[in-house]
Amino acid sequence: MFLTVKLLLGRRCSLKVSGQESVAMLKKLVSERLHVPEEQQHLLFRGQLLADDKRLSDYRIGPNASISVVVRPLEKPAPEDTRLPQPLWHHLGQVLAKHFGPQDTEAMLQLLRREHEECLQRISLGDLEQLARYLLTKEPLAQPTGEREPEVLSPNKEEEKEAVQ
Protein backbone atom coordinates (compact mmCIF):
# COMPACT_ATOMS: atom_id res chain seq x y z
CA MET A 1 0.00 0.00 0.00
CA PHE A 2 1.07 3.60 -0.50
CA LEU A 3 1.11 6.14 2.32
CA THR A 4 1.48 9.89 2.05
CA VAL A 5 3.83 11.25 4.70
CA LYS A 6 3.88 15.01 5.22
CA LEU A 7 5.84 17.42 7.38
CA LEU A 8 4.16 20.30 9.18
CA LEU A 9 5.34 22.96 6.71
CA GLY A 10 4.37 21.16 3.53
CA ARG A 11 7.12 18.77 2.40
CA ARG A 12 5.65 15.38 1.62
CA CYS A 13 6.47 12.05 0.05
CA SER A 14 4.74 8.84 -0.92
CA LEU A 15 6.03 5.57 0.54
CA LYS A 16 5.21 1.99 -0.41
CA VAL A 17 4.86 -0.17 2.72
CA SER A 18 2.92 -3.18 3.94
CA GLY A 19 0.45 -3.09 6.80
CA GLN A 20 2.78 -5.40 8.74
CA GLU A 21 5.61 -2.83 8.78
CA SER A 22 6.54 -1.45 12.18
CA VAL A 23 6.28 2.24 12.95
CA ALA A 24 10.06 2.17 13.61
CA MET A 25 10.64 0.95 10.03
CA LEU A 26 8.34 3.68 8.70
CA LYS A 27 10.43 6.25 10.63
CA LYS A 28 13.54 4.86 8.96
CA LEU A 29 11.95 5.28 5.51
CA VAL A 30 10.80 8.81 6.38
CA SER A 31 14.33 9.63 7.55
CA GLU A 32 15.76 8.51 4.21
CA ARG A 33 13.19 10.34 2.06
CA LEU A 34 12.59 13.56 4.02
CA HIS A 35 15.98 13.79 5.77
CA VAL A 36 14.53 14.02 9.28
CA PRO A 37 16.43 11.98 11.91
CA GLU A 38 14.35 9.14 13.35
CA GLU A 39 14.86 10.30 16.94
CA GLN A 40 13.31 13.68 16.07
CA GLN A 41 10.17 12.26 14.45
CA HIS A 42 6.70 12.06 15.97
CA LEU A 43 4.39 10.24 13.54
CA LEU A 44 0.68 11.00 13.83
CA PHE A 45 -2.28 9.26 12.23
CA ARG A 46 -5.67 10.92 12.76
CA GLY A 47 -4.21 12.86 15.68
CA GLN A 48 -2.86 9.74 17.41
CA LEU A 49 0.85 9.40 18.17
CA LEU A 50 2.26 6.19 16.66
CA ALA A 51 4.46 4.02 18.93
CA ASP A 52 7.68 2.58 17.45
CA ASP A 53 6.97 -0.97 18.65
CA LYS A 54 3.54 -1.19 16.98
CA ARG A 55 2.70 -2.18 13.41
CA LEU A 56 0.81 0.02 10.96
CA SER A 57 -2.04 -2.51 10.96
CA ASP A 58 -2.42 -2.02 14.75
CA TYR A 59 -3.64 1.50 13.98
CA ARG A 60 -5.82 0.35 11.05
CA ILE A 61 -3.76 2.42 8.65
CA GLY A 62 -4.94 1.54 5.17
CA PRO A 63 -3.90 2.32 1.60
CA ASN A 64 -3.60 5.99 0.65
CA ALA A 65 -3.62 7.08 4.30
CA SER A 66 -1.88 10.28 5.32
CA ILE A 67 0.68 10.30 8.14
CA SER A 68 1.84 13.59 9.67
CA VAL A 69 5.41 14.07 10.89
CA VAL A 70 6.08 16.49 13.71
CA VAL A 71 9.79 17.25 14.15
CA ARG A 72 10.84 17.68 17.75
CA PRO A 73 14.07 19.44 18.80
CA LEU A 74 17.04 17.37 19.97
CA GLU A 75 17.79 19.33 23.13
CA LYS A 76 16.44 17.99 26.38
CA PRO A 77 14.01 20.24 28.25
CA ALA A 78 15.42 21.80 31.40
CA PRO A 79 14.07 20.47 34.70
CA GLU A 80 11.16 22.49 36.06
CA ASP A 81 13.22 23.88 38.98
CA THR A 82 16.12 25.21 36.89
CA ARG A 83 14.02 26.85 34.20
CA LEU A 84 14.53 30.60 33.89
CA PRO A 85 11.41 32.67 34.52
CA GLN A 86 9.70 33.68 31.33
CA PRO A 87 9.73 37.43 30.73
CA LEU A 88 5.99 37.41 29.96
CA TRP A 89 5.12 35.97 33.36
CA HIS A 90 7.55 38.31 35.13
CA HIS A 91 6.03 41.39 33.48
CA LEU A 92 2.51 40.13 34.01
CA GLY A 93 3.33 39.64 37.70
CA GLN A 94 4.55 43.23 37.91
CA VAL A 95 1.35 44.55 36.34
CA LEU A 96 -0.85 42.44 38.61
CA ALA A 97 1.15 43.54 41.68
CA LYS A 98 0.10 47.14 41.00
CA HIS A 99 -3.56 46.16 41.38
CA PHE A 100 -3.54 43.22 43.81
CA GLY A 101 -1.81 42.13 47.00
CA PRO A 102 1.09 39.64 46.89
CA GLN A 103 -1.08 36.57 47.61
CA ASP A 104 -3.73 37.54 45.07
CA THR A 105 -1.06 38.32 42.48
CA GLU A 106 0.50 34.87 42.90
CA ALA A 107 -2.92 33.19 42.76
CA MET A 108 -3.81 35.09 39.57
CA LEU A 109 -0.48 34.15 37.96
CA GLN A 110 -1.02 30.47 38.78
CA LEU A 111 -4.54 30.58 37.34
CA LEU A 112 -3.35 32.31 34.16
CA ARG A 113 -0.48 29.82 33.72
CA ARG A 114 -2.88 26.88 34.13
CA GLU A 115 -5.35 28.35 31.60
CA HIS A 116 -2.46 29.07 29.22
CA GLU A 117 -1.27 25.44 29.42
CA GLU A 118 -4.82 24.14 28.87
CA CYS A 119 -5.22 26.31 25.77
CA LEU A 120 -1.90 25.08 24.38
CA GLN A 121 -2.97 21.47 24.93
CA ARG A 122 -6.09 22.05 22.79
CA ILE A 123 -4.15 23.28 19.75
CA SER A 124 -4.40 20.73 16.95
CA LEU A 125 -1.91 19.92 14.23
CA GLY A 126 -4.31 21.52 11.74
CA ASP A 127 -4.29 24.74 13.77
CA LEU A 128 -0.48 24.78 13.72
CA GLU A 129 -0.38 24.15 9.97
CA GLN A 130 -2.86 26.97 9.38
CA LEU A 131 -0.83 29.35 11.58
CA ALA A 132 2.44 28.40 9.88
CA ARG A 133 0.89 28.88 6.43
CA TYR A 134 -0.43 32.32 7.46
CA LEU A 135 2.89 33.41 8.95
CA LEU A 136 4.84 32.24 5.90
CA THR A 137 2.58 33.90 3.33
CA LYS A 138 1.27 37.05 5.02
CA GLU A 139 1.79 40.35 3.27
CA PRO A 140 4.39 42.77 4.66
CA LEU A 141 2.91 45.46 6.84
CA ALA A 142 2.28 48.86 5.29
CA GLN A 143 4.58 51.75 6.21
CA PRO A 144 3.45 53.56 9.38
CA THR A 145 1.67 56.89 8.84
CA GLY A 146 4.06 59.78 8.42
CA GLU A 147 6.85 57.69 6.92
CA ARG A 148 7.08 57.44 3.18
CA GLU A 149 9.39 55.47 1.00
CA PRO A 150 11.77 57.57 -1.10
CA GLU A 151 10.25 58.46 -4.42
CA VAL A 152 11.86 56.79 -7.41
CA LEU A 153 12.13 59.22 -10.27
CA SER A 154 11.56 58.03 -13.80
CA PRO A 155 13.53 59.72 -16.58
CA ASN A 156 10.43 61.80 -17.47
CA LYS A 157 9.97 63.00 -13.89
CA GLU A 158 13.66 63.99 -13.69
CA GLU A 159 13.25 66.10 -16.83
CA GLU A 160 10.09 67.70 -15.41
CA LYS A 161 11.90 68.50 -12.16
CA GLU A 162 14.84 70.10 -14.03
CA ALA A 163 12.45 72.14 -16.19
CA VAL A 164 10.71 73.53 -13.08
CA GLN A 165 14.04 74.63 -11.56
UniProtKB/Swiss-Prot annotation:
Keywords: Cytoplasm. The keyword Cytoplasm applies. Its main location: cytoplasm. Gene3D superfamilies: Phosphatidylinositol 3-kinase Catalytic Subunit, Chain A, domain 1. GO terms for cellular component: cytoplasm. May have arisen from retrotransposition of the X-linked UBL4A gene during mammalian evolution. This is Ubiquitin-like protein 4B. It comes from Bos taurus (Bovine). The lineage of its organism: Eukaryota, Metazoa, Chordata, Craniata, Vertebrata. The gene is UBL4B.
